[in-house]
């Protein structure tokens, strides 16, 4: 198939805004496309060479190399290319114009007889696709020269219009505005017999997120082949998405009165695929992130008790010394391509699993949630770092609200509420009311540090095993002359701080809660209120576990600090000099801000 057919379609699509007209153009294009190359045509329409999840290299061509390639292909100087690019503001248009000038010179015989005049051939879609693939896959020593030679050769054979779109494709600026939905509309019409085939095409794409692959099956094997599509280990499934509500009563009505309510962790959503010892991990956006999480790969090999499986969960950063969850931002350290072994130590992670999509040849996406969850529990050997997401089953709005506040207290973003009825299937690639996320519509950002009193201590884990690993902290309520718990802090301590804790706390350890202490959370060791520490956190939040300002803002809950961190000891302050509960209440109200949707 000549590449000019594709370039002509690109040009027509650029000047229209109607999706219906776009569909008509794609229908005409697909009718001309040989079935064996439909996948390549679809990828080029999407502005890519292959799906992101394959983890294959991108083109890796910068602007300077493109300018060199255009100069070589058009017998121009690089400064001429740069000058035209500057005036037009579009490198593709610059290539088109220079190519037209060059071809006009050739026609008029104005070129020197000694000049190199390449033999021009008509480009095909396959040639363009294969050449660009070779450009992308060229790596290592000498790869820049290889890329330049391939691009210059491709542009030499291209017409002016073809050159424009080749350059734009390589730049990642095709700007056609064609969505996957429009491509699926056209595929259904051409190969499926009409719009009635559209849901079948979409479901197949949702189960195997590779539209070129789906198009080729449809074009070469027919609609019945798509009807039989199941999940395939190694090809990501497009994730199911949730609607949003902030009222527990309304939420339970929406899902049928009873639901699973599970923590919505502040981490990276991950789809984990297992085939024997081979593991793939895909992000919410279906990018291959396996290399970022070699520790999760190890967990999946060990603890998924099935030969083939596709499970979903959340990868969450945590502090191994305290067990506390850490903010999503800390996972950014895992993005590095080098020294990942260092990042593993700096940012340890846990996996909280919440769904099963496929296991040992059986598609679970059409099964209701209780059945999927039961099978998930069956095939997972739960450990501290690889476990099922914390959840409850409830039909009670008050119980839902309490669990929501507990989730916030434990470092989660909120909760997910999931329908349990027989139609509660896994709707791949779809946002709907089978899942509802309940997140706070407010937050109280913590700008200032506070001074809190130690009222208890917790034994450490991991490196802190055999030592104290965290402290229970309180504010002072002068009206009642009591100390009210605010947070459990285990972060921010240096090793020497941890080493000194036994000696510091020893004079104040008591066998029971001090009579001036009001606390719901029970530490391993109670401490007489005496030591004061400066604490900072991400934000002030409401908690059913702490007693600072209990019942003042909302029945049954107090004020707490999310992601608290130790700054330093305040030996200059006595316990009654600590931040008061009233001060925390004022901070909470003053800093309250609406969260954007």
UniProtKB/Swiss-Prot annotation:
CDD domains: Adenylation_DNA_ligase_Arch_LigB (cd07901), OBF_DNA_ligase_I (cd07969)
GO molecular function, a single term: ATP binding
Catalytic activity: ATP + (deoxyribonucleotide)n-3'-hydroxyl + 5'-phospho-(deoxyribonucleotide)m = (deoxyribonucleotide)n+m + AMP + diphosphate; ADP + (deoxyribonucleotide)n-3'-hydroxyl + 5'-phospho-(deoxyribonucleotide)m = (deoxyribonucleotide)n+m + AMP + phosphate; GTP + (deoxyribonucleotide)n-3'-hydroxyl + 5'-phospho-(deoxyribonucleotide)m = (deoxyribonucleotide)n+m + GMP + diphosphate
Cofactor(s) for this UniProt protein: Mg(2+); Mn(2+)
Pfam families: DNA_ligase_A_C, DNA_ligase_A_M, DNA_ligase_A_N
Residues binding ATP, per UniProt: 262, 269, 284, 314, 354, 431, 437
Keyword Protease: no
Cysteine-cysteine disulfides: none
Name the UniProt record assigns to this protein: DNA ligase
């Amino acid at each position: 198939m000549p590449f000019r057919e594709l370039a002509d379609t690109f040009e027509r699509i650029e000047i229209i805004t109607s999706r219906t007209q776009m569909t008509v153009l794609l229908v005409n294009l697909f009718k001309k496309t040989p079935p064996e190359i439909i996948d390549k045509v679809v990828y080029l329409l999407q502005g890519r060479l292959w799906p992101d999840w394959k983890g294959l290299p991108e083109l890796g061509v910068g602007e300077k190399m493109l300018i060199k390639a255009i100069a070589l292909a058009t017998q121009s100087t690089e400064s001429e290319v740069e000058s035209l690019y500057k005036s037009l503001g579009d490198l593709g248009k610059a290539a088109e114009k220079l190519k037209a000038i060059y071809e006009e010179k050739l026609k008029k015989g104005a070129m020197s007889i000694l000049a190199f005049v390449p033999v021009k051939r008509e480009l095909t879609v396959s040639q363009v696709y294969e050449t660009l693939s070779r450009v992308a896959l060229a790596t290592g020593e000498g790869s820049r020269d290889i890329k330049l030679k391939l691009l210059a050769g491709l542009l030499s054979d291209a017409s002016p219009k073809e050159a424009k779109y080749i350059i734009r494709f390589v730049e990642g600026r095709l700007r056609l505005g064609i969505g996957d939905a429009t491509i699926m509309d056209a595929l259904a019409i051409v190969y499926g017999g009409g719009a009635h085939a559209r849901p079948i095409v979409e479901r197949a794409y949702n189960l195997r997120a590779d539209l070129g692959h789906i198009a080729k099956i449809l074009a070469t094997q027919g609609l019945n082949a798509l009807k039989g599509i199941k999940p395939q280990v190694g090809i990501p499934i497009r994730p199911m998405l949730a609607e949003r509500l902030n009222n527990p009563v309304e939420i339970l009505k929406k899902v049928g009165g009873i639901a699973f309510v599970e923590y919505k962790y502040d981490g990276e959503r991950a789809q984990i695929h297992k085939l024997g010892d081979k593991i793939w991990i895909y992000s919410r956006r279906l990018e291959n992130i396996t290399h970022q999480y070699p520790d999760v790969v190890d967990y999946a090999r060990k603890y998924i008790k099935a030969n083939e499986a596709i499970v979903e969960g959340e990868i969450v950063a945590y502090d191994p010394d305290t067990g506390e969850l850490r903010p999503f931002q800390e996972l950014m350290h895992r993005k590095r391509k080098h020294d990942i072994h260092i990042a593993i130590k700096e940012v340890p992670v846990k996996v909280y699993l919440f769904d099963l999509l496929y296991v040992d040849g059986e598609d679970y996406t059409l099964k209701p949630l209780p059945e999927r969850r039961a099978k998930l529990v069956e095939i997972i050997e739960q450990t501290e770092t690889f476990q099922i997401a914390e959840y409850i089953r409830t039909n009670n709005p008050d119980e839902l609200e309490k669990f929501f506040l507990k989730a916030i207290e434990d470092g989660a973003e909120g909760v997910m509420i999931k329908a349990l009825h027989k139609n509660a299937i896994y709707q791949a690639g779809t946002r709907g009311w089978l899942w509802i996320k309940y997140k706070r519509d407010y937050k109280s950002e913590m700008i200032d540090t506070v001074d809190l009193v130690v009222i208890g201590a917790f034994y450490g884990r991991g490196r802190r095993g055999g030592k104290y690993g965290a402290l229970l902290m309180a504010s002072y309520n002068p009206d009642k002359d009591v100390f009210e718990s605010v947070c459990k802090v285990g972060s921010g301590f240096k090793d020497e701080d941890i080493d000194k804790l036994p000696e510091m706390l020893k004079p104040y350890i008591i066998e029971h809660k001090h009579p001036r202490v009001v606390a719901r959370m029970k530490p391993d060791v109670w401490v007489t209120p005496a030591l004061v520490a400066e604490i900072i956190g991400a934000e002030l939040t409401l908690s059913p576990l702490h007693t600072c300002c209990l019942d003042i803002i909302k029945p049954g809950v107090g004020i707490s600090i999310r992601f608290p961190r130790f700054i330093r000891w305040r030996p200059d302050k006595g316990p009654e000099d600590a931040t008061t509960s009233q001060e925390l209440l004022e901070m909470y109200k003053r800093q309250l801000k609406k969260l954007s949707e």
